Amino acid sequence: MKKKVIAYLHTHWDRERYREFESFRLRLIKVLDNVLNLLESGKIPSFYFDGQTSALQDYLEINPEKEALVRKLIKQKKLFIGPCYTLVDEFLTDGICFRKNLEIGLKYAKSMGCEDFLGYFADTFGHSKNVPLILKEFGIDKAVVWRGCPDIIPSEFLFNGIKTVNLIQGYFLDIFSADKSIEEKAEFLESHLDKIAQKSKDVLLLPIGADHLGVEPDIAEQIKAVNKLLKHYEIELSSPFKYFELVKNNFQFEYNQELRDNATTFILPGCYSTRTQLKKSNAKCSYLLDLANKFQKFGQKKYKTDSFDNVIEYAYKLLLQNQAHDGICGCSIDAVHRENNIRYEKVLQIATTLIKEILVETGENSMIINLSNQEFTGIIKFDSPVKYSEKEFEVISETRGVADAITYDSQKIPITEDYKPIYTYLAEIDHKTPSKLLSRTTKPYGGSYTQSDLEFTNTRIENSNICLSIKNGEIKLTDKITGNVYPNFIEFVNFKDLGDTYNFGPDKSDTGKQGEIISSEILRVGGLQSALLVKFKIGTIILDAEIALNKNSHLLKFKIIWNNKMRNHLLQVKFNLKEPITKTFSEDMNTLITREFDPNYEIRKNLPKEKGLEVKTNTAPMQRYVATQGFEVVTKGLCEYEVSQNTLLITLLRSIGVVSNPKNPARTTPAGPPILVDEAQQIGLNIAEFAIGFSSEENWQTAINEIYPQIIYNF
């Protein structure tokens, strides 16, 4: 008896990748016109539109006259859309944005009449263990995955409580579009289905479709012909939802960890460090847009300010368009990422303008609002046209401009006389607790050096919690709370990169070049913040490291500035701990997850030789935070860390120049086209920012709030 195969027609639609968005949209119009015609004529029973809504919205923006037909087909359960707005990367998108992705996607899908949803992540580069939990929040109890599944996982399994299907052979199947005889197609499918059957029971799931691919007009006839030739299988065109119904009792195997195994599928982990500028912009936009959203809700409740919900949704759509995996992962052509940068600029414009306009609307001249659910103690930086005395605030710079109270008041127009001094201050906030209504509180108090715990020389900076000192070309860190001393703790190292946008490609013989300290001096002196400027040299690279420390803080803040003139290289900062690193704690979807590592694993000794393999790495994604052995790092858009023996490394820059290098030593099969992308080399000015300190990972949110303060203020 033949096994039943439920096949569903689909297309995987990257809005932009090896072609620009508008170029792909023109292709989308052709593909979807064809699909709608086939659905309306009854030549195909249904079409699953990639688990997202943005592509359909892109189509209807050009062809609004097709909306009635689309609605009809959705109501007839022939066309399935959503639940997501875009197919974002799960490790480079935070939990707030991921929820917004579902919120916006479901809102639109339901407005179009769609009622059936599953978390469809067929091409995502691995899967966060937190995604099933978020799906549950939105009433979704099914998911489809592929990349990152270890070999032990069968076709059907429970992924953190969600009924999940593992696409054993992936989503990409274009055999029905190939120039082959029906006999050749049947032979291929027999072998293909045999592999799926090894991990399935009586019913198999077969995706039919591929990236940006339309449906063959005679697909039903082809399947009918193929069925006559298949020995062990009978293919039925239907939908993923019918498959889930047929196998509803098969979900016995449980797996509750993240899906990042690359033994059988590529997870392309080099994407976490490709085009770091995109990641930095993404982190900044995600932070500020969330802050603006919280503040506009607060303003509506407390001050009856205008609602900006529609503006916030528009900004999140722009941000989510950039978080689609071929966007945020940096593995598209240069023109695509230039457009990404424009969208990021738009999001920043919206977020900053909203915050400042709402501040003007409140009518408050002096206010501090803590929008987090945690008490805040720390230093904030703010601009003001008011010349405060040094007893109130610590001034750190002066420029000229127009006050926000004029710029963001729609009843005022700036004139030449409004162009006046603008001062940048540091202010200390002490034990600012969020009230139930997040209400207005008093002005913070300033500090003076005589009241400060900061101490410094040209080669040392410290407070009551932490000390950094430089001697004999090495940086020593001291945790003054525990008394632990870490000699030669911070180093910079540079490696060759023979890879591409998808994977770092190590040179077998490359041991890396270590940076050397060439100078150290006091950069800034103050009672609230002091800073050193330390210069490093690595070959031809000169790094300027601004190292700042705030009064009473546990965190040293680093701002690394350099002019990158090198190509095809990997630049990292190393932190040399006392013990081999076997476990890390890192941020994932705004929660902390634990990962285990083999500290002795060496990538250069394990490069693949057989076709179709991707090297295992000791790198992992992070969103803003990683910790181990009581040491913590908070970054501003640096999303990749690595473990090597007793060393934790953070990637500052990965310069590469090709989308997919067919000679990449880390991967024996191409992952995309070999298109040259010179802008991925990131030649020119680069800035990397992170903070380090000693604390238990249980206090990770406190560290996050110091670097990403949930504070709105106006002086």
Show the residue positions of the predicted features:
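CE4/NodB-like, metal-dependent polysaccharide N-deacetylase domain
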Residues: 99-137, 190-205
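Catalytic grooves of carbohydrate-active enzymes
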Residues: 7-23, 165-363, 371, 430, ...
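Short, solvent-exposed turn/loop segments enriched in Gly/Ser/Thr/Pro and often Arg
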Residues: 48-57, 84-87, 119-128, 146-151, ...
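N-terminal catalytic cores of secreted or lumenal carbohydrate-active enzymes
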Residues: 1-96, 100, 108-110, 137-140, ...
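Alpha-helical scaffold elements lining the catalytic groove of polysaccharide deacetylases
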Residues: 89-109, 170-196, 511, 530
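Surface-exposed loop and adjacent secondary-structure segments within mature catalytic domains
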Residues: 69-76, 128-176
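Conserved short loop/turn motifs at secondary-structure junctions
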Residues: 52-56, 87-90, 117-127, 208-213, ...
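C-terminal (or distal) subdomains of carbohydrate-active enzymes
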Residues: 131-134, 155, 177-191, 231, ...
